[in-house]
Amino acid sequence: MARWIPTKRQKYGVAIYNYNASQDVELSLQIGDTVHILEMYEGWYRGYTLQNKSKKGIFPETYIHLKEATVEDLGQHETVIPGELPLVQELTSTLREWAVIWRKLYVNNKLTLFRQLQQMTYSLIEWRSQILSGTLPKDELAELKKKVTAKIDHGNRMLGLDLVVRDDNGNILDPDETSTIALFKAHEVASKRIEEKIQEEKSILQNLDLRGQSIFSTIHTYGLYVNFKNFVCNIGEDAELFMALYDPDQSTFISENYLIRWGSNGMPKEIEKLNNLQAVFTDLSSMDLIRPRVSLVCQIVRVGHMELKEGKKHTCGLRRPFGVAVMDITDIIHGKVDDEEKQHFIPFQQIAMETYIRQRQLIMSPLITSHVIGENEPLTSVLNKVIAAKEVNHKGQGLWVSLKLLPGDLTQVQKNFSHLVDRSTAIARKMGFPEIILPGDVRNDIYVTLIHGEFDKGKKKTPKNVEVTMSVHDEEGKLLEKAIHPGAGYEGISEYKSVVYYQVKQPCWYETVKVSIAIEEVTRCHIRFTFRHRSSQETRDKSERAFGVAFVKLMNPDGTTLQDGRHDLVVYKGDNKKMEDAKFYLTLPGTKMEMEEKELQASKNLVTFTPSKDSTKDSFQIATLICSTKLTQNVDLLGLLNWRSNSQNIKHNLKKLMEVDGGEIVKFLQDTLDALFNIMMEMSDSETYDFLVFDALVFIISLIGDIKFQHFNPVLETYIYKHFSATLAYVKLSKVLNFYVANADDSSKTELLFAALKALKYLFRFIIQSRVLYLRFYGQSKDGDEFNNSIRQLFLAFNMLMDRPLEEAVKIKGAALKYLPSIINDVKLVFDPVELSVLFCKFIQSIPDNQLVRQKLNCMTKIVESTLFRQSECREVLLPLLTDQLSGQLDDNSNKPDHEASSQLLSNILEVLDRKDVGATAVHIQLIMERLLRRINRTVIGMNRQSPHIGSFVACMIALLQQMDDSHYSHYISTFKTRQDIIDFLMETFIMFKDLIGKNVYAKDWMVMNMTQNRVFLRAINQFAEVLTRFFMDQASFELQLWNNYFHLAVAFLTHESLQLETFSQAKRNKIVKKYGDMRKEIGFRIRDMWYNLGPHKIKFIPSMVGPILEVTLTPEVELRKATIPIFFDMMQCEFNFSGNGNFHMFENELITKLDQEVEGGRGDEQYKVLLEKLLLEHCRKHKYLSSSGEVFALLVSSLLENLLDYRTIIMQDESKENRMSCTVNVLNFYKEKKREDIYIRYLYKLRDLHRDCENYTEAAYTLLLHAELLQWSDKPCVPHLLQKDSYYVYTQQELKEKLYQEIISYFDKGKMWEKAIKLSKELAETYESKVFDYEGLGNLLKKRASFYENIIKAMRPQPEYFAVGYYGQGFPSFLRNKIFIYRGKEYERREDFSLRLLTQFPNAEKMTSTTPPGEDIKSSPKQYMQCFTVKPVMSLPPSYKDKPVPEQILNYYRANEVQQFRYSRPFRKGEKDPDNEFATMWIERTTYTTAYTFPGILKWFEVKQISTEEISPLENAIETMELTNERISNCVQQHAWDRSLSVHPLSMLLSGIVDPAVMGGFSNYEKAFFTEKYLQEHPEDQEKVELLKRLIALQMPLLTEGIRIHGEKLTEQLKPLHERLSSCFRELKEKVEKHYGVITLPPNLTERKQSRTGSIVLPYIMSSTLRRLSITSVTSSVVSTSSNSSDNAPSRPGSDGSILEPLLERRASSGARVEDLSLREENSENRISKFKRKDWSLSKSQVIAEKAPEPDLMSPTRKAQRPKSLQLMDNRLSPFHGSSPPQSTPLSPPPLTPKATRTLSSPSLQTDGIAATPVPPPPPPKSKPYEGSQRNSTELAPPLPVRREAKAPPPPPPKARKSGIPTSEPGSQ
């Protein structure tokens, strides 16, 4: 037999399809699940998913993609570590975590966050794929890593997940390998970085002006990206477009041009540039970004003929001005607009012509045509006019571009925006240097601008069309190829031809080009300008020769470069070839300035070649701007560099160096420094230059400290270590420095000294490097100890300086403290580190106390940051000083201590001591512990939790505690001199720890920091616990408060939110457990041990420690619970033994109180309840004396927990207020039994609030009444627990009770329970009248009571219906299961609405269609079955109302209120069926339900506590029916007699239903069934009942007579036929009845109308028993023959409704002997009339007045038009899910009433003591819980486990079309 083989290589994989397990042995997989594979066998793997390691199973091999992994501890306990990059693993786990949250966001409809997360997730997935591809270069991978980590961190913050701390390379920090301080700083940095990123994104989203924002403060260089889309303009010739940035306020161009050559065909000249015309204008500084206005301008130059329409014979290739296009881009530059996709239209303005027609005659010849005049205006002039104009008439012509501002220099832009900027992108540089000059940026650009000229027209009648040709030549006259660049985007050209203006004497060009030549060529080169007239005729143009030449040299004779600015050039004319001979004309002056100088010298050259008069008339002006990193225009700098050739000017040049522009100096940094040190060394004889060179060096170092030149720091460093070679410079430099410091009191030297101190770091680098070079060449022996002495001397000078009074040289002192530590790392290379440490100690000590405190602390911080402090022997010297200074600071109570600087210093010390490479640290830790631990603690205790420094101090404390080992702890305790000192320290520490645990110093998302704190605290707590046990355990030394604080601290730690693993995601939980374990268990076990160690002291902690221990036991960790729950038994036992009372009441009360608080706060679960009960019972049963009382208590607590858990579940999860009420009452019940009034009252008010929210004012009143009943009408003070938080401010019980009564009366009034309100107001009135004598209050109360009386009679008060609801099946919770409840419906609520409301609470419940009690099969079913039907309340009238004519409005209250019994009747058949008269065998089964409490009460439902059933015989049923009918007729007649305004329709329907045999039939059934000899022979005992029935039939006649009479009086035309029919039928009926059953007359007093005192009619309700008693029978007896002689062919009906059973019998003729069930579906319109007959068959015969609910349908307007046969008067009791219309009642039309017959019940009577006499009611059924529902087939047994078949093949993977799809058919899952 084959077997499973352990895998060797296949250890780790990912599911690539979903797999649904079909057997228990299989493991379900979802796509993406990672699996650890343990074994394999024939195409199957066995293992588990890494998300749930506890469940192992098998799964098909083909569903898994294997991945590389490292296996640790191979074998039974092996673990797999994926072999992917750590970043990929982080990405994977992040995506898994986000995916879960992403789904939740969608479910919770948080769509904005959902979409944000979706985009971030897509980005991460894409980047993960790129990383996994392995194709990225190293630098791109590093860049992508930054993007990935930034995105993860941002997403985590957005989702409220934990902050991930990383090192500089983006790798996650391991807290075990990182110091606490470094960890804290990393959290701060990460938090700040994410916050800045979020703010940056917000700013972009909100389109904020980003100037001044952090993004601009960190970036100094920008670029503007321009993407040229199209140029729409009808030129007809080629064109050149010059785009540049322009400042309209200063009328200057900011950048060089970007050139686009546009063809005459409307496309780029180079077709490859189509859709690829883009440029970046670089080097923009932050100053450029805040210019008030910036424009993007485009100048268009036409290249072709002089005139547009000229033909072939005309000259072509001329550059002619055409127009401009301008766009204001200020918003884009300022960052307000940022959309690289948006295309901007820049309107084109052609040069205007009309404006020049006027001027033509004045300045031009009349021969000129007008169309070219406008073209002579300079483009820059047009440009400014367009900018000034509000709008341009562009006629649809213009440019289309898109723009984007890019932060960073060119290199950064190419890296960060590679999708925009590539190799083909043109780079247009700024005409000037960027804000920050980079050392590697070699640039040699000379910008030349042709400004204007003036040329004599000579022999021509019109001015010339001058074209300037510009070229670059060397001194030999040789042309430099491609040296001129008209614009970026194209290579250089050799000659540049200017724009030609037509016949203009003084043309203005303003054309700028860039001359770019090699630096070494600059000294030899010059620029030549040739002037030529261009003719529009091609033949003439060819013959035109250059008429003039001008030139300018790029270097001045003194070696400086041509100065920036304007230059007036001399235009030389002549026809000889000397004009082209550079050797010749270079001897001439190039500029007017040179000429003036030469004229003074009267040179010989001027004699041989003197310009003619014409040449002096011509002028030409240019402007130059040089942007060169290698050329200087500064004479002084050049003089310094060439100092040897002009040594007499050294002093002058050194002084002038300070005035040279920094940009010039950094260009020649190395040369300048070489010159300085050469001067110092070569001129060593004289000290004259030493100070000047020193000052110059300081100036240069300071210059490089400027932000503009900060990137030259590496250049300076490189110079010092690679090029600097002055071996003796240290002597001179240190001498000068010493002199300056020693003479600090010389005010003339103050600024020089201050500058020197700022440059101290680099000064000393020069000094030390010089000394190193010296030692390398000469060794130590030459100068003895001279150098060391100079260092000592320097420190001595500093010490003297620091010791001077503060007001003197405070600036210098501050600078010394700030900059002196910067020399440490260099000096220690050539100076003894220990001595250096001593020197620094003396330096610090020389500063007077309380002076420059912050500067001093910062100085010490820098000392600690230096490498000096990392040497153990140096620390021996420095640390005592540092701890002294710190302890002085932290102890300083008089002045405000500098917490920021102190924490910085302390954290740096501790961070160094935590390093592995700094030697032994134990002694140093001990020193810090002894001197600073207590001070740190006290600082933390005294510091505000909102202080910005609290986090740093706590980190220092954690770091120190972490670095202390066990011996440190022991030693520290031994340093305390007295026992009290130890107590004080422990007290402080415990209180501080507890405070820090309770109020988190660090943000919740600083998970690593918080867990590090927890781990350190746990160790410290355990260490201090040992101290407690050692010093404070025995009877003499026991410290109660200390132990108490320990326990409370330990519990606070254990219950801290950061340790509650259950609340975290699985991923986070695994992370924490793997790194830190479950710390709760460790501290929990320690708490247990410490408790048991207390011995006889335990009693001192009862009951105070019950709550904390309860918190521990409630922690959802099974082992911890098992370990700590027995402490409860120990407490019980302890109190039982030591209290002297032989009980544990203190413990019991405290546990109940705390349990209530904790469970309500969300703690505890079902498992806890079971475990608590089990463990307590186990321990109690073993105890000799606690076995019985302990067992009772254990069960009691278990019961309480069950109620509280139910309550919490409903409150937290169920939206149904009813279910919340139910659980609240359950808890109330418990606390009432336990006499815990404090908690009881608290829950009363919770219930009150729930009722108030639901507008259940009656129930709210009854709830408050329970509180009022606990109070007395006395002046006893109110104990606190009797008052609630929202209660009134009162002092005595009487005051509180009065306030409560007023509120209760108000609620009763709102709930229309005026009878109850009257009762309470009487009690309150008595108090007002005879106790407190508040007559004013009494008057108001009586007025209110009067209104209640009035409301009872006049106000409409609908009666609620009552419903019985049975919950059957095991699917319901235990407190509902197989129980019946009676519900009080809301106003106008029908049964259909009610049942629907219930079913929404229990969606899984199945409606039962039967009203029969279900069988055992239903009750034991795992499903939920619900039975719902209407029941009728049994009225219980007060004795004072019996046998009295009580008004209907008063009785109505008792019909539906103050009831506790309810009835439901169901017909069934008994005996043999009589085909002629089924009525004789139809019986009624009447069920009476008695509830636990009277309605209304504190709930709208109560459980049925007793059910009794009786059977009503057909004869008794007939009697009841007749009595009810007679009551209805009587009262309907009375109402119509007394109130003529009532509608006659209900009376018509009632009468026709009784007297018209065609509608209802007659009483033939009664006659057939009961009025026969046979019946009386068989039932002689019924003789009296038969007589009674006959009398009731006879009694109906006088009532009908009165009814017919009133009907006739209120007759309308429409009703006449009906009335005639009624009268006819009634005459026949009356004649027959009087003949057989006698004549009965009613006394007149029954129909008298009584006036109330106010004149209103009081309508008495007359019962059928009263009618019988008071009626007079004139025919004493009637004999009814057995032959049913009253049938008269048509059956006659004896009652208002006839028999209830008649319709049933007609429909059920074929049914069996007993009707077992009346289905809900059988009720239809035919049996609705039986409602009249089903109204509560069950009234006691002893009652004179019985309860009957009004029948609303008789008066409802919706029923008026219906035929009598379909009267909607049926009782709901036979139709559980079809209710009647709600009852209605108005003062003007009281509803017709049908009292119940008097009949004795067979059921036992129930007590109805009212709410005060009964316990608090149990809960109503709450909504079912999800887990309590079950499927229909859940009763089936689970199928047996599959047997492994050897040959079973694994299922094939699903088709690969969609990996995410779930396979529809899988062999493996069948």
From Swiss-Prot:
GO molecular function: GTPase activator activity; guanyl-nucleotide exchange factor activity; small GTPase binding
Record flagged with keyword NADP: no
Main location (coarse class): cytoplasm
SMART domains referenced in this protein's UniProt entry, alphabetically: SH3
Phosphothreonine PTM sites in chain numbering: 1794, 1814
Domain DOCKER, chain residue ranges per copy: 1231-1642
Polar residues bias: start-end ranges: 1797-1808
SH3 domain location: 8-69
Entry-annotated residues carrying N6-acetyllysine: 818
Cross-referenced SUPFAM superfamilies: ARM repeat (SSF48371), SH3-domain (SSF50044)
Keywords from the UniProt entry: Acetylation, Cell junction, Cell membrane, Cell projection, Cytoplasm, Guanine-nucleotide releasing factor, Membrane, Phosphoprotein, SH3 domain
Sites bearing Phosphoserine, chain numbering: 365, 1756, 1766, 1785, 1789, 1834, 1869
InterPro entries the record matches: ARM-type_fold (IPR016024), C2_DOCK-type_domain (IPR027007), C2_domain_sf (IPR035892), DHR2_DOCK5 (IPR030717), DOCK (IPR026791), DOCK1_5_SH3 (IPR047025), DOCK_C_lobe_A (IPR043161), DOCK_C_lobe_C (IPR043162)
Domain C2 DOCK-type: residue ranges: 443-627
Region feature Disordered, mapped onto this chain: 1679-1702, 1772-1870
Subunit-level organization: Interacts with CRK and CRKL. Interacts (via N-terminus) with tensin TNS3 (via N-terminus); the interaction increases DOCK5 guanine nucleotide exchange activity towards Rac. Interacts with ELMO1.
Its biological purpose: Guanine nucleotide exchange factor (GEF) for Rho and Rac. GEF proteins activate small GTPases by exchanging bound GDP for free GTP. Along with DOCK1, mediates CRK/CRKL regulation of epithelial and endothelial cell spreading and migration on type IV collagen.
Stated name of the protein: Dedicator of cytokinesis protein 5
Species in which this protein is naturally found: Homo sapiens
Lineage, top ranks: Eukaryota, Metazoa, Chordata, Craniata, Vertebrata
Gene: DOCK5
